[in-house]
Structures are given as C-alpha cells and as structure tokens.
Amino acid sequence: AASQLAASQIAASPKLARYKPFVEETRRSQPFNLSQPVERALTVRGPYVGKDPIVQFYDTELSLLRFEDPAGGKEPINMELLLSKLGSSTDAALRARALHSLSEGLKGFERVAALSLNVVAGGWLVENKERGYATVRSRRNVSNNVPDSVVESLLEGVRTTGVALSKRYYALKKGVLAKTQGLSALTWSDRNAPIDVGAGAEKEVSWEEAVGMVKA
C-alpha cells in the first residue's frame, strides 16, 4: 500500500518525479533489507569497519607508490604517469621498460592488496548471503535494475564469442604494429600500445568504408 501511495504521489507531482529513480531503487532493494537494528548497526559502523575505509586505505597506499621512470628520468614517477606511457608511447622498448618498472614497483604491495581484497570481497559475500541475494552479483544487478539472467547472458557471450573477438582484435593489432612500429611479435607490454597509422591518421573515413574495413 505504501509503495502504491508513493507511486501515485510521484505520478501526480512533477516536483516529486525527479525522485522516481531513487524511490524505485529503494523499492527494489526492500525485500533484501535486514532488521532495523541490524541495518542501523551496519550504517553506524560503516565509516570505521566497512569497505569504504579499506578502499580509501588501498587507494591512498597505491597513490604513494613510486616507480622508476622508463624514459630515464632521475625522479621516480607515480603509477598514473607510468601507465600513461604504456598506453601512449609508440616506442616498444620504452613500453617494455615501463611494464618492468611497474612489476618491480608493485613488489611489497602484495600484502596490502591481498588484505584489501579479502576484506572487501569477504564482507560483500557474507552480507549478500545474509540479505538473501541469489548470487554475488545479484545485489549489483538489483541496484542497476538488470535481471540476473541478462547479466549471465552477457558473461556467457564474453566467455564464448568474446574470446574469438579478442583474439581477432589482437591479431589485427599485431599486424598494424608490425607495419607502423616494426614489431615482430606482440608482447605483453604491447597490448595497450597506441595504433599509429602515420600521415593517414587525419583522413576522414565514411561509415560504409569503416564497415567494409571491419568486415574485411
């Protein structure tokens, strides 16, 4: 009755209509609510023992890491700048050094990463079971208003068709990088390498031409 009343009030008021998505999400999650004392306890403790402080701690520790500059700079660089070199440099040797620098710089961070993952994933699993969600993804699916079956279909598509498409993509990329950067093999550090097509980069291509290129 309360849900129907809220729906009718929203329908009758343009001012309330802006809150419709919030109300609908609240209604979808209502069957999974715990008792009021338990919900209150979780809310009160959240800033101190929930996932948020762990995620904040992880992000802070990660931001403090410094890595050897693969470009030869004397000053260490942060992860954001290092990763940008992996994705923007057309120099295969520099990309390889960047990946090596990343691997070396992350040594010693394993314990922080493992602890953070265990706390967040473990807490998510336990709480979702207590709330009665069908799978570990169901809570997110309810929030996104997407049925579990749709998400499972997407995952199955990635596991099957997605594998073939991924292989085809990297085979095509290997061919392009072989022509533009002289690579004889596509290494791990070349996965996110930019595709530089040289002087033709600014050429406009029609939709029909683009479709033909993809289907070729």
Describe the function of each predicted region.
Residues 1-215:
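A well-structured
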